[in-house]
Structure formats: C-alpha cells, structure tokens
C-alpha cells in the first residue's frame, strides 16, 4: 500500500473492526472468498436468520433494507450472459443545469467503477484541476452526544462546502477513536441525499463515501442506491491486507484488492440487473429497496419515499446500537477490552 495512505496496527484494526460491527464471519465467509476468488462466496439459497428488527444481535442499518426485483414491468437482465449491455462507469462532479446545454456541464470525472482503492481516493482528494473542488466532511461525532444532532451538523457542513464552491464531497469516518463514534454510513449518505434534494443542491454535488463500515455486496448496493457516487471501503481493504499478512490469502495485496473490488462490483451489477437496470449510473440514487422494521419518522426524515409497511427502530435505537458497538471496541472506563471478533452464526448455526 502507498506510504501516504493511513495504515493501522493489528490492535487498531481490530478495534475499528469491532466498532463497525465486523464479525469473524465477515472475514471468513465474506471478505476472504471475494479477495481469493474475485466472486461472492457460494452459499445455500434461503435464509432462516431473524429479521434485523427481531434479531438479538446489533445488526447494521443495511440489514433493515431488502432488495426489490422486477416482477411485471421492466424484465430482469442476465448480468452474466448479457454483460455486454452492462456498465460500471460512473461520473463524479457537478451535473450542471440539465435544461441548459453547455460545455461546462461535461466537466466531470469519469471512473471505471464506483469502488475506490485508498490510492484512488487519495488522488481524487489531492486533485488540483480547474472545475473541481473537493471537500472532506467528517461523519463522526463525540460519544455520548446526539446522533440526530450529528446528522444536522452534517447538513451545515455540506451547506458550507457548497457555498465555498465544492462540487465533490467526501464523507469520511476515518476519525473514529475512543472518543468519537461514526454516524452509520447509510444514514449519513441517505440523510444528506434527501437534504440536498430538498434544498435543490443535489445536482451541484457528488458524494464519495470513505467508510470502514461496508464490507458485503448488499452494503455497497444500499449505499449506491441511496445516493453515494463512489465508495472507498478502507477498513475492508485493510482487512484484505491482514488476510494477506496472515497467509490466509496466497497472493499479493494488490491482486487481492483487485479481486475483492471486482467481486463487489459484479455483485452490484447482479443486484441492479434483477430490476432490469443495466448501468450503475442508473442505479445510483434509485432507492429500490423496502425497509423492514424502521420507524416511520426515521423513514420520512432520512429515507424519504422508501417503501416501508411496518415500523420499528427509532433514531435513538440506532444511536444506542452504534454506542454499544463502540463500547465493545473502546471500553468507556478505559479498561483493556477483548477485541477478538465474535462469531454471530449468521451464515452457519452456532
């Protein structure tokens, strides 16, 4: 990895993994097969695990959303045999006024797929090109303070960046430590997406997420579906480095990262194809999900117009879940904590 990209010690990495809800299964059954084979791990059809709202575990917010699929109107696409009609290319930057054609509208950054390596993000962050201005906004907040207030602060920071001329926002939770907790990445992305739409600023800004939370294909699909333009899963990629260093992967770091990223993007294309969508750009911001077990007030405020037939967790419940995970990684009393990853039995009976 590039020297200028932040790296973690083994203990720091384990604490971050626990803070973001990683389990032993996340490494063994999700990240390892993808980094090893370049495709998602194979498993049996069907699931008998409890819904996230009924689970006794602290489930990530991603798991409260179910993917929809085409049933009547646009037919699904075979993403393998019809790969020629699919595209993973995305464009980052201000979209300009769609009703006024002019050359400035075409000044965007073209990237081959929305899953960024640490080096890719570093290049975008340090870009000094006329017509592009990149601003990083932290999506962490001081522990024991309000998650709802932290989201409101995110709106204020985005408004400030917009006034300063930024057209690319990087939402980053790299500052998580013993005193700072991350806003759940899906909540941060969707809340800001809805705010920018309501204030008529969305087409002037692109959102890139730099987060340690996403690691499975469904996580990335929800983030793109709720408004992210691109995602840098820095902790998942650092976990791949861990697997290489521990000789659980018989390949070099760069090849393993390429295979992991390829598995993620292939999985996203497959999910989009179920709805008859052939390009990632068309899938972005589409919100083709159904929420199960989230309170109506949370849906209306942060996931506006998302299908939701039953209520459930409130913003306070989400805050409590985040704080519980953080306390398991960074003991609030400053005592030594066991940072070994738990096995939750999500993929196999325990």
PLM features: what roles do these ranges have?
Residues 1-150, 154-161, 165-168, 214, ...:
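Flexible, glycine-rich loop/tail regions that form catalytic "lids" or insertion modules at the edges
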Residues 143-146, 150-219, 225-227:
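Conserved structured catalytic cores and adjacent interaction surfaces
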């Amino acid at each position: 990895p590039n020297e200028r990209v932040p790296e973690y010690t083994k203990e720091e990495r384990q604490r971050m993994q626990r803070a973001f809800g990683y389990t032993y299964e996340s490494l063994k059954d999700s990240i390892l097969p993808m980094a090893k084979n370049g495709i998602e791990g194979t498993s049996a059809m069907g699931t008998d695990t409890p819904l996230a709202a009924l689970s006794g575990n602290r489930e990530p917010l991603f798991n409260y959303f179910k993917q929809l699929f085409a049933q009547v109107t646009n037919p699904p696409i075979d993403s393998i045999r019809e790969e020629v009609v699919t595209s993973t290319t995305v464009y980052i930057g201000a979209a300009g006024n769609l009703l006024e054609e002019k050359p400035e509208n075409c000044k965007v950054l073209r990237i081959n797929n929305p899953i960024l390596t640490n080096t890719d993000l570093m290049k975008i962050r340090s870009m000094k090109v006329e017509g592009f201005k990149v601003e990083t906004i932290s999506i962490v907040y001081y522990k024991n303070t309000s998650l709802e207030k932290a989201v409101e602060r995110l709106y204020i920071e985005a408004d400030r960046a917009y006034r300063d001329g930024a057209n690319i926002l990087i939402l980053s939770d790299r500052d998580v430590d013993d005193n700072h907790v991350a806003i759940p990445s899906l909540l941060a992305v969707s809340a800001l997406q809805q705010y920018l739409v309501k204030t008529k600023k969305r087409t002037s800004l692109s959102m890139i997420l730099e987060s340690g939370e996403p690691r499975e294909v469904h996580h990335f699909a929800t983030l793109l579906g709720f408004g992210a333009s691109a995602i840098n899963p820095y902790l998942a990629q650092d976990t791949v480095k861990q697997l290489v260093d521990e000789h659980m992967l018989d390949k070099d770091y760069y090849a393993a990262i390429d295979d992991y990223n390829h598995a993620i993007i292939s999985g996203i294309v497959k999910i989009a194809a179920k709805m008859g969508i052939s390009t990632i750009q068309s899938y972005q911001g589409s919100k083709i999900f159904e929420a199960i077990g989230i309170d109506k007030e949370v849906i209306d405020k942060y996931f506006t117009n998302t299908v939701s037939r039953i209520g459930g967790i409130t913003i306070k419940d989400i805050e409590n879940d985040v704080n519980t995970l953080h306390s398991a990684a960074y003991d609030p009393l400053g005592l030594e904590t066991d940072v070994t990853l738990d096995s939750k039995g999500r993929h196999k009976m325990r």
